[in-house]
């Protein structure tokens, strides 16, 4: 049986604002500048990097220092192990050390192999090696994420 193709970037006006259909969450959400980047990043992960749609949790809830937080997305492996935490910012937001620190806090709780930061224009990807994060010069495919070495 062939999987139904996902419908990306479907928008419609509702109550004075633009909504976008998120095919992974299977619901309409407000199309904010950050949501636009999140949708484009999810599209990249699923359609170009080979991440199975069912292995992506969008707005993944976690606790950081006792506070409820949400990672924009977490990619999981076949056994449910976290492979990548994704943090998206609006295109107008610079990816500063403050943004990296936020993502690193999420990374320390979830402990995936990879960390991805993006504002839709710039992408920073890191691989966890022991207690440090090593910058990568490319975005890993799902197959690469599933292997222990790059």
Label each residue range with its predicted role:
Residues 1-114, 121-150:
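A short, conserved, highly charged catalytic patch centered on acidic carboxylates
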